[in-house]
Amino acid sequence: MVTLITEKLQSQSLDDLTCKAEAGPLQYSAETLNKSGRLFPLELNDQSPWKVFSGGPPVRSQAATGPDFSFLPGLSAAAHTMGLQWQPQSPRPGAGLGAASTVDPSESTGSSTAPPTKRHCRSLSEPEELVRCRSPWRPGSSKVWTPVSKRRCDSGGSATRQGSPGAVLPRSAVWSTGPTSPATPRPSSASGGFVDSSEGSAGSGPLWCSAESCLPSTRRRPSLSQERLAGAGTPLPWASSSPTSTPALGGRRGLLRCRSQPCVLSGKRSRRKRRREEDARWTRPSLDFLKMTQTLKNSKSLCSLNYEDDDEDDTPVKTVLSSPCDSRGLPGITMPGCSQRGLRTSPVHPNLWASRESVTSDGSRRSSGDPRDGDSVGEEGVFPRARWELDLEQIENN
C-alpha cells in the first residue's frame, strides 16, 4: 500500500495538478488521471449529473442536456481514447482539482459547532490527521465493494494550494459543511465517477478550507475507506503505532494480560498453594516420634514393649495377656496380688512373655522379698538384665 502511494506521488505531484487547474478547462487523459491517484474514470449516471457552481456545493441538474463530463455511462474504455474534460460553468482562479477547493474562505458561512469532547469509539471518530490523507474519489456501494474501516492515519500529508496564488492549506485543515448542506447522506449516484467530492457534496462531502474560517463539523464519517488514504505522503501509521497515535493503547497498560502471560499468574497461584501446604504440615502428624525412638532404643528383643508412662490400671490386662494364672483360677480374671510362682507356673512360651512379666509382676516380687529386686523396682522394664534372669528361672522351674 505504501509503495503504491509513493509511486503515484512520484509520477505526478500536487503542484502539477494545481498549475494545470489554473490554466482553465483542460483535457486529462485516463492515463494521467490513473497515475495521479486523485481522479479515476468511473461510470456516471446521466440522469443525475452534478454541476459545480462557484462558492457553493454542487447542484444537481435535472436536465441531462448540459453534463459537465464528456463521456457516457458504461464507456470507460472510450475514456482512454477521447480524454476527459472538466469544465466548471464559471471559470474562476480558485477552480482546482484533487484536494483543491473552489469555495472561498469568506463565503463558507455554514453553521458549524465545536467537535465533541470525547471520542467514544475510534471507528466513529475522524481525527484531524485523516483530512490530509483523504482522496476525493470514492466508489459507490455495491454488492462487491464495501467500505472497510481503517486505523487512524497519522501521516503528515503535503499541503495543497488553492487556486489563488499564495493561499496554502495548513496542516491542521479540518472538515466543514456547506451553507445549504442537509443532514441526509450522500446519494449513491454521486458516490461513483468523476465527481470531485472536495468541491463539496450535499451534506457529507469534505470541503478544504483555510485555518481562518474552518471549524470541525459535528457530523463525522463512521468508516474510512482505503481510497481516502491514497494521498498520504509518508508511510502509514500501523507499521509503528504509539499511544499518541492510538489513544486506546495507553489505557491497556495497566490491565492484566491473562492470555498473553499465563506463566506469571500460574506462578503466583503455585506460591499461594505452597504456603498453605507449609502451614498444614505442622498440624498434620498425629504420631509421637519421641515414644517411637525410645522404644527402638531400649528394646533388645522382638516382643519387648516398654511402656514407661502406663498406670497401674493397665497391669491386670497385661498380666492376662502375658502370663495367665494356673488352671485353678479363671484365665480372664487375674489380680496383681497373686504369687509370682502362680504367675510363672504355666507359661506357654516363656521367652515371649518374659518381658511383660517383668513389667506386670512388680507387686508380687515386692511381696516375695527378692533382694535383687529392691534396687531395680522401677527399672525392670527398662534394663534387660533382670529379664534374662527371669527367663533362666522359668527354664529351671519347667
Curated annotation (Swiss-Prot):
It comes from the Eukaryota. One of its GO terms (cellular component) is nucleus. GO terms for biological process: protein import into nucleus. A motif (Nuclear localization signal) lies at residues 268-276. Residues 103-115 have a biased composition (Polar residues). The modification Phosphoserine is found at S125, S301, S304. Pfam families: FAM53. Its main location: nucleus. The keyword DNA damage does not apply. Residues 123-132, 363-375 have a biased composition (Basic and acidic residues). It is found in: Nucleus. Residues 85-253, 336-398 are annotated as: Disordered. Residues 176-193, 234-250 have a biased composition (Low complexity). Keywords: Nucleus, Phosphoprotein. InterPro entries: FAM53 (IPR029356). May play an important role in neural development; the dorsomedial roof of the third ventricle. Belongs to the FAM53 family. PANTHER family: PROTEIN FAM53A (PTHR28567:SF2), PROTEIN FAM53A-LIKE ISOFORM X1 (PTHR28567). This is Protein FAM53A. The gene is FAM53A.
